[in-house]
Design a protein with these regions (language model features):
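Active-site gating loops and adjacent loop-to-helix segments of metal-dependent hydrolytic enzymes
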Residues: 2-33, 71-94, 150-178, 198-201, ...
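Divalent metal-coordination and catalytic microenvironments
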Residues: 3, 47, 65, 116, ...
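Alpha-helical scaffold segments that flank or form the walls of functional sites
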Residues: 4-70, 93-109, 355-365, 369
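Alpha-helical segments flanking ligand/cofactor-binding loops in enzyme cores
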Residues: 41, 63, 130, 134, ...
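Metal-coordinating catalytic core of metallo-dependent amide/deamination hydrolases
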Residues: 60-190
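His/Asp/Glu-enriched, well-ordered alpha-helical/loop segment
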Residues: 171-178, 220-306, 320-323
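Helical hairpin unit composed of two closely spaced alpha helices linked by a short loop
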Residues: 190, 211-213
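Active-site microenvironment of metallo-dependent hydrolases
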Residues: 275-373
Length: 373
């Protein structure tokens, strides 16, 4: 959240290695708590009722989620490079995962779910894949991973192993549990068949993929193969906002532009990716994703009485092609109002903003010794 607008107009590798990772090294739990509170506020403002997040200092993230009332699937991002000594029981990130699962998994009747994670094939090694896959299976956890986001990443894996990232991870049982694979921009047709067989959900992030020039995911191909495809924003650092309505429209337009078919990914299908398919990917199909008797009252209201939404010949069309998160007037989770008309009844926005300006931003962006303490 702190890195919104810090590094734009770059490819993924330059963006990560030269800008994002170095600043993330300066984060601490206090900074992440303030940033997470504001990120949740932004998500609620734009009508998101449930999120998935892979990051660091997840105990503080869970605290913010618990206070806010939003639903969340949280995973501690895991990376490990060759040469690192590895033992699951002593590896710091794995110990954090265990503590996180013991403390927060299924908190508040499942409003918070803890998941395992592998940042990506190219930022980790087989020892980590094996250990996390085993832990996820034994503890009934889902798993998050970034998969084939760029052509460079995908091709390097094929050159190294003779297999695609999806095939390599499958060899190490990573897909033995429900997995959400972010991006899937360069997965092959064979990958799609494999991922569908393993019930892997793809989190399509069209705005981030376009902004980083990573490519255009073959959403129609994945759906045709039988994959569940939902939507994500990736992050404010690569997007640069959390407005899921932008993703809905971008996904529909990208599919049409990629195929040359104006009927590709029609409005209803694009909207389902943000609702039904998202709930399915999070393992929440029994509680949300549709408005139906017996489901949680996870609802949003939009103000259609505005010049850019008049006249309304087709509600679905407006939701996909004309509306934005700024049109959301109310966001409710489990029947509790979390955002309404500019107010956040469960969040201390002023306090979080003060923390961000007084502590988090100086810590991450000041080059003095206090920033690295």
């Amino acid at each position: 959240y702190l890195l919104r607008g810090y590094a734009d107009d770059l490819n993924l590798q330059d963006w990560l290695e030269h800008y994002i990772f170095p600043r993330e090294d300066r984060l601490d739990g206090r900074a992440v708590k303030a940033a997470s509170t504001l990120a949740i506020a932004e998500a609620l403002r734009f009508g998101t009722t449930s999120v998935s997040d892979m990051y660091y200092f997840c105990d503080e993230i869970c605290q913010a989620v618990a206070e806010s009332g939003i639903k969340a699937n949280i995973s501690r991002g895991m990376s490990m490079f060759l040469g690192d000594d590895f033992c699951f029981d002593t590896f710091p990130a794995c110990r954090e995962l265990v503590e996180l699962k013991d403390k927060w998994h299924n908190h508040d009747n499942g409003r918070i779910k803890i998941e395992a994670s592998i940042h990506a094939e190219y930022t980790s090694t087989y020892q980590l894949w094996d250990a996390l896959a085993e832990y996820a299976v034994n503890n009934g956890l889902q798993l998050q991973v970034h998969l084939s986001e760029t052509k460079k990443e995908h091709d390097a894996c094929v050159e190294k192993y003779g297999l695609t990232p999806a095939q390599v991870l499958d060899c190490h049982r990573v897909f033995d549990v429900p997995v959400v694979a972010a991006h899937c921009v360069h997965v092959t047709q064979e990958d799609m068949q494999l991922l569908a067989k393993r019930h892997v959900s793809a989190a399509h992030c069209p705005v981030s993929n376009l902004k980083l020039a990573s490519g255009c995911a073959d959403v129609l191909g994945m759906v045709k193969a039988g994959m569940n495809v939902c939507l994500g924003t990736d992050s404010v650092a690569s997007n640069n906002n959390l407005d899921l309505f932008e993703e809905i429209k971008a996904a529909a337009l990208m599919a049409k532009g990629k195929t040359g078919d104006p009927k590709a990914l029609p409005a209803e299908a694009a909207l389902m990716m943000a609702t039904v398919c998202g709930a399915r990917a999070q393992g929440r199909s029994a509680e949300c994703g549709v408005i139906e008797l017996g489901m949680d009252a996870d609802l949003i209201l939009l103000d259609f009485n505005q010049p850019h939404l008049i006249p309304c010949h087709n509600v679905l069309s407006h939701l996909v092609y004309a509306a934005s998160g700024h049109d959301v007037a109310l966001t409710m989770v489990r029947g509790k109002i979390l955002y309404a008309d500019g107010k956040y009844p469960t969040l201390d926005i002023a306090g979080a903003l003060k923390e961000l300006h007084d502590y988090a931003i100086p810590r991450v962006f000041s080059d003095g010794p206090e920033a690295q303490a």
